Amino acid sequence: MSFGLPTTGMTALKGLREEYAKRTVEGDIGMRYSIHGIVDATDIAHVSELSGLSEQRCKELIDYLSVHTDVVPKDDDDELEALDYALASLAIEVAVTRHAGHLEQYYSPMGISYMQIGKDLTAVKTVIVTGGALIHTKRTAQIASHALFNPLDAFSLKPKEAQVLVDRKYILAAMGILSTEYPQTALRIMKKELVKDGNH
């Protein structure tokens, strides 16, 4: 959580300041029921590049998984594991890009200036991830790294350096409820249960 106000000179905030705690839900991107949403939000070429599979094979597997939503990678299913890695990475990238703010460049009498739309999350120090595709893989840290700033998207205000914690037991929702009455207890449980899975 962060107020996300501009942190650099010559940057103005566009619109109203957002709340300290902000929640977004990306219902159009998911690993099975909304699997086509990931492709729509990025493109099949990105899925192919990250998975190492051909675009045609990615399309075939994605169509199959959209119907057979209970299928998960088995130990010997390298194709499906590679596809899930790509889909989870892109889902996180899209979700955090939408959640974070971004800069727009414009010219003023003072020279190049910037307009900030949304929250500046570049200084956020911790990212917590959860979900089956992140819990049941050995590549959690690699997938979670897609939540962080990418120099190729220079105007994004995603976190630049953040410790990645994994909620492997799906406790976050319960801790949110618990924290309304017992905040210290909820914090203590989260500190114990959230697992460090890479420092980027």
Region annotations inferred by a language model:
Residues M1-H200:
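Helical "lid/coupling" subdomains associated with nucleotide-phosphate turnover
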